[in-house]
């Protein structure tokens, strides 16, 4: 689907369809009022007859409205005007796209950017409309023999902005929205792949393909088990030693800064392409969803796609820490003590607490790049789901300014995160009688103690941890990857690059 932006009055639009809003109870938006006036009250007369109440999710398609140049007008219910929030705005856009496709519209001019969403400007409304529109069209059917392609005739959407001076920000919003939507799609496609296809070698192949794409400014290095042994990444290696699939760490390096002394921002993603739990094996129910234990790595891949697409003036390194946790005669055991790359020793109390063992060595490895900051992304703990449900990603950090930046980006993007504490009491829970620390902290505060563990390997730089166990995928009828937190991290990097126009209200 193509997107563009223009500034013009509704009565002058020669389009297949104009999209305008109606509020509860049967109250026309300002643009709808203009069209109603031109049509000599045709639209308001329909509303008085009860054709449309204006609730979110309702719609009414009008054909050949008197004195209106466009062939059709699509009225979209927007709920109560004063209660319109970000979530409802996205629902309205999704309903609009679905309705246009159902009714066979090939192109349309959208005036829903006139809607007032508190604290949000036209850049935000256009960008979110693009991202939401692309999201509503997503389907993962690559592995189906009968793809049953959905009818999607809509080819072009034009967003109207109030004044010509807002055209530039509108065009930038479309550019950013398309790049982020493509990054989210890439992350979802990678996450949804089954584990018999998507293993660490598959992750590495995707990283190499990204580097080989035109003008990517990315170089990829893949570190295999032999090199890991030489380096001393024993915790990472232990997790994968029960699997027949080799553990591989893919390092994607993007150089976009003109400052040759600029330090890189580093993203490290947990890439457990399947997590059986190992010897501490999981229960059978829902184990198929453990293919999603690599969503952190998929997020890193998606964000690197965004960075490359937008050619951000930053240096960014993305690490996909790929491996598979399986039981077997060579698998690591509860009771093992591992010497990590940092030299710290870890007592294994539970082989299903494996993500932190992979990440701890990856976090030590990236010290060599002298990073500006490091953010790790991981489907790390069920405890985070207990604490925050499926709505917020957990955020923990050793640096308050970095945490605040990420929270700001989460609020701007609508890809929400919530900060959890890391205090001395939680660190005490990961003490071990036999090693420097244990890989679990017992009952209570599991998301926090996992982050405390990781922080012990992130002492030489500013660091943040995003626990996406509750937000990376959906279960049930709508099962599938969400692509989160690609939008959050993309916004964070846009802010760092000074490229975002999302902060100020109109």
From Swiss-Prot:
Give the subcellular location.
Answer: Cytoplasm
Report whether Hydrolase shows up as a keyword of the record. yes
| Cellular-component GO terms for this entry | cytoplasm
Location (main, coarse)? cytoplasm
Per the UniProt entry, the Enzyme Commission number(s) are 3.4.11.1, 3.4.11.10
- How many cofactors are bound and how? Binds 2 manganese ions per subunit.
Entry binding sites for Mn(2+) 2 = 270, 275, 293, 354
Q: Which InterPro entries match?
A: Leucine_aapep/pepB (IPR011356), Macro_dom-like (IPR043472), Peptidase_M17_C (IPR000819), Peptidase_M17_leu_NH2_pept (IPR023042), Peptidase_M17_N (IPR008283)
Instruction: State where Mn(2+) 1 binds.
Output: 275, 352, 354
The Swiss-Prot or TrEMBL record lists the needed cofactor(s) as: Mn(2+)
Tell me the protein family, please. Answer: Belongs to the peptidase M17 family.
Which HAMAP family does the protein's record reference? Cytosol_peptidase_M17
Q: Which protein are we looking at? A: Probable cytosol aminopeptidase
């Amino acid at each position: 689907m193509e997107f563009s932006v223009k500034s013009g009055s509704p009565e002058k639009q020669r389009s297949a369809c104009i999209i305008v809003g109606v509020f509860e109870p049967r109250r026309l938006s300002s643009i709808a009022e203009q069209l109603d006036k031109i049509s000599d009250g045709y639209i308001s007369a329909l509303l008085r007859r009860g054709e449309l109440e204006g609730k979110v999710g309702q719609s009414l398609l009008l054909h050949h409205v008197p004195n209106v140049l466009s062939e059709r007008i699509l009225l979209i219910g927007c709920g109560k005007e004063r209660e319109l929030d970000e979530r409802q705005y996205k629902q309205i856009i999704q309903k609009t796209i679905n309705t246009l496709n159902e009714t066979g519209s090939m192109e349309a001019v959208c005036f829903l950017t006139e809607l007032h969403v508190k604290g949000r400007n036209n850049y935000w409304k256009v960008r979110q409309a693009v991202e939401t529109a692309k999201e509503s069209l997503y389907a993962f059917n690559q592995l189906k023999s009968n793809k049953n392609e959905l009818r999607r005739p809509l080819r072009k959407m034009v967003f109207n902005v109030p004044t010509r001076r807002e055209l530039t920000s509108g065009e930038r919003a479309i550019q950013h929205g398309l790049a982020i939507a493509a990054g989210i799609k890439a992350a979802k496609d990678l996450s949804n792949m089954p584990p018999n296809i998507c293993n660490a070698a598959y992750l590495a192949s995707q990283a190499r393909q990204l580097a080989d794409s035109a003008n990517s400014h990315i170089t990829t290095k893949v570190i295999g088990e032999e090199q890991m042994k030489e380096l001393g990444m024993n915790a990472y290696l232990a997790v994968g030693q029960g699997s027949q699939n080799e553990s591989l760490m893919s390092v994607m390096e993007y150089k976009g800064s003109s400052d040759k002394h600029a330090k890189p921002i580093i993203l490290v993603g947990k890439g457990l392409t399947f997590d059986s739990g190992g010897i501490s094996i999981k229960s059978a129910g829902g184990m198929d969803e453990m293919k999603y234990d690599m969503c952190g790595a998929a997020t890193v891949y998606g964000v690197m796609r965004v960075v490359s697409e937008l050619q951000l003036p930053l240096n960014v390194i993305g690490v996909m820490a790929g491996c598979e946790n399986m039981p077997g005669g060579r698998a690591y055991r509860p009771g093992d003590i591992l010497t990590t790359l940092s030299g710290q020793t870890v007592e294994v109390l539970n082989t299903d607490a494996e993500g932190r063992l992979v990440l701890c060595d990856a976090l030590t490895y990236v010290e060599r790049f002298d990073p500006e900051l490091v953010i790790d992304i991981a489907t790390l703990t069920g405890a985070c789901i207990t604490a925050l449900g499926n709505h917020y990603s957990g955020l923990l950090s050793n640096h308050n300014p970095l945490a605040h930046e990420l929270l700001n980006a989460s609020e701007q993007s609508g890809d929400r995160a919530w900060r959890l504490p890391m205090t001395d009491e939680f660190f005490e829970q990961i003490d071990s009688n036999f090693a420097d620390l244990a890989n679990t902290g017992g009952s209570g505060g599991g998301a926090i103690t996992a982050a405390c563990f990781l922080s012990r390997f992130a002492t030489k730089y500013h660091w943040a941890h995003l626990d996406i166990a509750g937000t990376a995928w959906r279960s049930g009828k709508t099962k599938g990857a969400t692509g989160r937190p690609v939008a959050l991290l993309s916004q964070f990097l846009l802010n760092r690059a000074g490229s975002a126009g999302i902060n100020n209200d109109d």
